[in-house]
Amino acid sequence: MINRIAYAASTPLALLTLCLLGSGAARADSADSVPPNTVRLGLYDIFYHVHAQDLSGPYVPPGVGIDVQNVQTLYVAYVREFFSHLDLELAIGWPPLTKTEGRGPARLGSVPYNGQVISTARWFGPSLVANYVFLSPEHALRPYIGVGINYTSFYDRNNTAAGNAASGGPTRLSLSPSVGPVGTVGLTYRLDRRWSFYASYSFSEVQTNLTADTAGVIRTTHVSFAPGALIVSAGFSF
């Protein structure tokens, strides 16, 4: 009967990305400074904090809700340093298969519901984040904070057999895309001019309107995912 989340690039993000890639921003660094471009590769460990309104529509008893299982996926990012304390990060996670569980009554009639995986979906959620990096570049270990914007869209939305049974038949799902803020805190450790390691925690706001269509019978709910993501990665600068 549903599914989702989340992480950054709608039309304004695309424009910002073009500016990022094409900018020749001056850098007040010495000739042997770290190169301005970095590619990061690592792991997203995503934790959902789901708040969903009870499902509404025909033949829906009170207290019928959902939850989302946590996931892990690949983290890829391009980072452009503009100044020694400021960079812009475009982060993209490999779209993971995310599972939605029923929450509420143990059964809907004779059909098991609570704890059953009722739907699956994949999401694509890039984020564009401006990071402020503390301390001078001479320090190997530097903390940073960042704020930005996230865009999340959903696809490959499918009800499971358990979801179709709970819905009363084959059900089509739709979830609206989401645009919301994202914040991050992290640490970077530089090994040399080229190689570095990163650890961070990001928090974003992802919301969607879910519609489930069972042979013309429409049920809806509004879902707020407040996904947190623990990220560890390695970076190569060029």
Please annotate each region the language model reported.
Residues 37-39, 72-76, 124-128, 179-185, ...:
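Hydrophobic, lipid-facing positions within transmembrane beta-strands of outer-membrane proteins
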Residues 66-72, 118-125, 173-180, 222-226:
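Short sequence motifs at beta-strands and strand-loop junctions characteristic
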Residues 51-58, 100-107, 155-166, 210-217:
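Outer-membrane beta-barrel translocator domains and adjoining extracellular loop/strand segments
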Residues 1-35:
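Cleavable N-terminal export/targeting peptides
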Residues 59-64, 111-119, 166-173, 215-222:
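Extracellular loop and loop/strand-boundary signature of outer-membrane beta-barrel proteins
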Residues 24-79, 235-237:
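Short glycine/proline- and aromatic-enriched beta-strand/turn motifs that initiate or cap beta-hairpins
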Residues 97-99, 183, 191-238:
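Predominantly the C-terminal beta-signal and adjacent terminal strand-loop region
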Residues 29-30, 45-47, 77-161, 225-238:
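Gram-negative (and chloroplast) outer-membrane scaffold detector with strong preference
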